[in-house]
Curated annotation (Swiss-Prot):
Family in the record: Belongs to the universal ribosomal protein uL10 family.
BP term (GO), one: translation
InterPro entries in the cross-refs: Ribosomal_uL10, Ribosomal_uL10-like_sf, Ribosomal_uL10_bac, Ribosomal_uL10_bac_type
Keywords: Ribonucleoprotein, Ribosomal protein, RNA-binding, rRNA-binding
Binding partners and assembly: Part of the ribosomal stalk of the 50S ribosomal subunit. The N-terminus interacts with L11 and the large rRNA to form the base of the stalk. The C-terminus forms an elongated spine to which L12 dimers bind in a sequential fashion forming a multimeric L10(L12)X complex.
The gene coding this protein: rplJ
Protein name: Large ribosomal subunit protein uL10
HAMAP family: Ribosomal_uL10 (MF_00362)
Amino acid sequence: MPKPEKVQKVEELYQKMLNANALIFTEFKGLSVADLTQLRGKIRPLNAEYRVVKNTLALLAIRKIYPDKDLEKFFVGPTAITYCYGDPFGVLKALVDYAKEHELLKFKGGIIEGEVYSADEVKELAKLPPKEVLLSQVVGAISAPLSSLVWSLKWPVNKLVWTLDAIAKEKEKISINQ
């Protein structure tokens, strides 16, 4: 029979995991409390939190959400989970930047919007620009050909108007001179 405190802790972890749109698993062995506090301070403004978890309890919680995914590999050794409630790519970038400064922080992998990623894939995803930048690039890519098309269709009409305007001005000059 599980202890009530552990049941409650599993439920808390489950709720955090359920509310997050991304979970990033890291190993923090060797990092000081000050280092972890600094890391938490960097990701807090990005709508994320970094928590050290007990592997068995976290695994019980995550199996409720992803029962068919092989996630045991993320819960070996000291584990911390970054819960991302906003844009996960900004948080990933902050974590990767922090890991460059603090080599003891190791990525284990992650789950982003329901997809499981390895440690290397998580690091690659961190290289992507933020969602807003990607969206603006897509809009730009879509609108550029349309703008060219509009200009191409408008050009002959503009040329005709300019020609007619030039003819009208020329006739006006001739009528003034007579």
